[in-house]
Design a protein with these regions (language model features):
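PAPS-dependent sulfotransferase catalytic core
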Residues: 1-115, 239-256
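PAPS-dependent sulfotransferase catalytic domain
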Residues: 117-234, 252
Length: 260
């Protein structure tokens, strides 16, 4: 399992709460949501750099990118698009107030627009692993999302697979052996291929994490262009300033059975 299982009663209680809160928010006049032109969703295996990229995109004045809200889950529960947009904006505000912290890192970008926006054009969610797990459980969700959350633009961040696997295998939260982590990743990538088969090529953007770290300004500008927004120089400089020049090298921390 990727995450500890949540008791069914608690999951249903959270959905009921979110339905009521987002329903009330959706009834209010929200001219700020009227300009949304694209929906951005992440897709892929964990520990590949999705959280950093999502936090940097959320720092853009015309974008809101939530942290692991789980859009497919809400669409499966029959939430309206407007309700989901309200939940995404609220999630981004909370994450910004917390400093966009993830594991041991803060992805806060001082002086930029995390948790708020101006002239909103793009809204989405950073939950690449969660998206694939939702589709594994409900294969019809991809088609539903493409219909109800259109137009959807996907971002897939990839990293040296040995580093990503080692990060999962050494995580105290996940508690997976290297062999189980490998099997888990294989399942995710099989699902990823099924999803890719339903997407137009121009709706999937591949971003290599190591290349991003080498040239964060250039790669971030390319990502913004894919999403249809300009990338101001001040925004790019502020985002590049928080990026580590070298990722944690974790592949040497675990040993795998050669036969695995």
């Amino acid at each position: 399992m990727a995450y500890p299982e949540v008791p069914l009663w608690l999951d249903l209680a959270r959905l009921a709460r979110d339905f009521a809160v987002s329903g009330a928010a959706a009834l209010r006049s929200r001219p700020d949501l009227a300009g949304v032109e694209r929906h951005c969703l992440f897709i892929g295996a964990p520990r590949n750099g999705h959280s950093l990229i999502g936090a940097l995109l959320d720092a853009h004045p015309q974008m809101v990118v939530a942290h692991e809200l789980g859009v497919p889950r809400y669409l499966a529960a029959r939430f309206s698009r407007r309700q989901v947009l309200c939940l995404l904006a609220a999630n981004a505000r909370r994450e910004a107030a917390r400093g966009r912290r993830h594991i041991h890192y803060s992805h806060a970008v001082p002086g930029q627009w995390q948790g708020r926006f101006r002239d909103l054009r793009v809204i989405g969610d950073k939950h690449g692993e969660g998206f694939l797990l939702s589709v594994q459980a409900r294969p019809w969700l991809t088609a539903t999302l493409l219909e109800r959350f259109a137009p959807a633009y996907f971002i897939h961040v990839v990293r040296n697979p040995y580093d990503a696997l080692a990060s999962v295998a050494t995580s105290s939260k996940r508690g997976q052996s290297p062999e189980r982590a490998i099997a888990y990743f294989e399942g995710l990538y099989r699902t990823l291929e099924l999803v890719r088969g339903q997407l137009a090529p121009e709706r999937l953007f591949l971003l290599r994490f190591e290349q991003f770290l080498e040239a964060p300004r250039e790669r971030l500008a390319e990502t913004c262009a894919y999403l249809g927004v300009d990338a101001p120089a001040g925004y790019l400089d502020a985002c590049a300033a928080i990026v580590l020049t070298r990722p944690g090298d974790q592949r040497g921390l675990v040993q795998c059975d050669a036969a695995a």
